[in-house]
A protein has these predicted regions:
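Extracellular structured ligand-interaction cores
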Residues: 17-23, 50-52, 145-147, 339, ...
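Long hydrophobic segments that form regular secondary structure
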Residues: 254-288, 323, 328-360, 364-366, ...
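Extended, low-hydrophobicity, Ser/Thr/Pro/Gly-biased non-transmembrane segments
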Residues: 1-77, 361, 443-448
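Beta-strand-rich binding/interaction modules
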Residues: 311-314, 322-415, 508, 512-515, ...
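Short, glycine-/Ser/Thr-/acidic-enriched flexible segments
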Residues: 60, 97-99, 154-155, 209, ...
Length: 537
């Protein structure tokens, strides 16, 4: 974030935007490639076996996006034709001898370019786009304008050594850095407190790219698993902070799961509340208002409000509150009136962040959050009670009751479909109800979630006996898993990948958090033994 000040004197702030012309001169033999941001406008030979290249970036940018590469590298290149008919040179530069491992990354870049045109109407704005991958780059990747710098982990892949996840990660990271070209570069953040403006939004965009390129259901499951393992503990610990913190001692400490992953969930909730079409209009308005500017999270939310007509005043609290909200749900069915009543209650426990604010004399945000709760009601025959399958409820009070009429039979409630909000859910459901959701829920994420909750219950029973033996494993759970596997083997596209996720047991870290939440002592050995025993049963 603040590396340019180590190169030369400069007002090193993200809101100081300038156009750069960079001339590089070096020895031809040692440094055959001379690269920088923007378009190559001139090059030539110099005295003494040297050569030079002049790069001009026509778009104003903050200095943290400057990059310069002088090296001996191999290059794999191709041409991408934009929606308007422009030809863009796409190039991947790697250390000599590794060119055969770059094909997937180059293809991923072209896929990302096409997807951004189709989904958000955003076209590549330069004559060329370059990726430079080196093994000792200290981050995963960086979105320097037109010249992305990558660690080789997210570029190099060979079919005989790389896994499916390696290829997916290359797709996602290449996409993420390219998507920054608009959400981060063309429109950047006014100050580092607004880091999630570009990172949360761009993570959301790369998540949507991954969902469209691969499996939407599997991608969402993987995202939520990461959120629960990496971000929820951060929210519950001494380093808890909101998506937009009020203070920091060191900017490098800002690159957290909260700013990135929870920030993406905040953007996703906006789309859930206003709808996908209105969200696209909001993105169009955001760029129309702020292209070439350094702006704030408030500017982004304001564009979404203006484009949708939805008041997001209360929703803004998500940007200022630390911690993971807890959502308690209770449902009741009146057979005579054919009415289902759902009561939702939200709480948010104080975190160490609020204590630090009070010590510093800074204001503390309070009041209930605006939580989108996507709900479905699954009838005994496995069908959805709603014609539209899912309804999005706006929980804006500490406690609210929602009434659903003309429900013909006792339903099983499917809450937080597609994980519509980053919260803990407390909702008592029987094993039979969870098994029903696992088999019939039209929401793929909640089918997986029901299976995870069932597996957690089984594993907690095993942990209680130290993970020894197998008489704590119910036959009904084994049967349910067999049905999932059978469905995956005879299903349609992506069903095998979804079945693999459904049969993956909750992580040991997740189980440890559940045990701790019950007030019990965490026994890592018992957790490990129980998980291995169930997996091998």
């Amino acid at each position: 974030a603040e590396g340019f000040r180590r190169i030369t004197f400069f007002p090193d702030r993200p809101d100081v935007m300038a156009r750069y012309t960079c001339t590089i001169e070096a020895d031809c033999e040692r440094f055959p490639q001379l690269l920088s941001n923007g378009n190559l406008v001139a090059k030539g030979e110099a005295d003494g076996g040297r050569h030079w290249a002049r790069w001009e970036d026509p778009f104003a940018k903050p200095c943290y996006l400057f990059a310069l590469v002088a090296a001996r590298l191999d290059v794999l290149e191709d041409v991408f034709v934009t929606a308007s008919g422009r030809k863009v040179r796409c190039a991947v530069y790697v250390e000599p001898g590794k060119l055969d491992q770059c094909g997937h990354a180059l293809a991923a870049l072209k896929k990302a370019m096409r997807w951004d045109e189709e989904r958000f109407g955003l076209e590549m704005d330069l004559d060329g786009y370059m990726i430079v991958a080196v093994g000792d780059f200290n981050m995963g990747a960086m979105e320097n304008k037109g010249l992305n710098i990558f660690n080789t982990k997210y570029v190099l892949a060979r079919q005989d050594t790389a896994t499916d996840m390696d290829y997916q990660n290359i797709d996602r990271v290449v996409g993420h850095e390219y998507f920054h070209n608009w959400t981060g570069n063309r429109v950047t953040c006014r100050d580092w407190f607004q880091l999630s403006l570009k990172e949360g939004l761009t993570v959301f965009r790369d998540q949507e790219f991954g969902a469209d390129v691969h499996s939407r259901a599997v991608t969402r499951i993987q995202e939520v698993r990461t959120l629960r393992i990496a971000q929820f503990p951060e929210d519950a610990g001494p380093m808890a902070h909101p998506v937009r913190p009020a203070s920091y001692a060191e900017i490098n400490n800002f690159y957290t799961a909260t700013v990135y992953e929870k920030g993406a969930e905040v953007v996703r909730m906006i789309q859930t509340l206003i709808g996908r079409e209105a969200f696209r209009r909001g993105m169009d308005l955001y760029f129309a208002r702020h292209d070439g500017q350094a702006v704030t999270c408030e500017d982004f939310v304001a564009a979404m409000e203006a484009a949708s007509g939805v008041n997001l005043t209360q929703f803004r609290r998500w940007y200022a509150r630390a911690g993971t909200p807890r959502l308690h749900a209770a449902g009741q069915y009146d057979a005579a009136a054919k009415r289902f009543t759902l009561t939702l209650t939200q709480t948010l426990a104080p975190t160490a962040y609020e204590a630090r604010l009070r010590e510093a004399g800074l204001p503390v945000e309070d009041g209930p959050l605006h939580i989108p709760v996507a709900v479905g009601l699954v009838l005994p025959d496995g069908s959805d009670a709603f014609l539209a399958q899912t309804r999005v409820l706006s929980l804006t009070e500490t406690c609210q009751t929602f009434v659903f009429e003309d429900i013909p039979a006792t339903p099983v409630a499917s809450l937080l479909r597609d994980f519509s909000a980053p919260v803990h859910l407390d909702f008592e459901q029987t094993d039979t109800e969870l098994a029903h959701l696992m088999a019939h829920d039209s929401d793929a994420f909640n089918r997986w979630e029901a299976g995870q909750r069932l597996a957690t219950r089984v594993l907690l029973a095993g942990i209680a006996v130290g993970g020894r033996g197998n008489d704590w494993i119910p036959a009904s759970f084994v049967t349910a898993c067999a049905r999932v596997l059978e469905a995956g083997l005879r299903g349609v596209r992506d069903s095998a990948a979804l079945a693999a996720e459904a049969l993956t047991l909750p992580a040991e870290q997740v189980l440890a958090e559940v045990v701790a939440g019950q007030g019990r002592v965490i026994d890592p050995d018992a957790i490990h033994r129980a998980r291995i025993q169930l997996r091998c049963h």
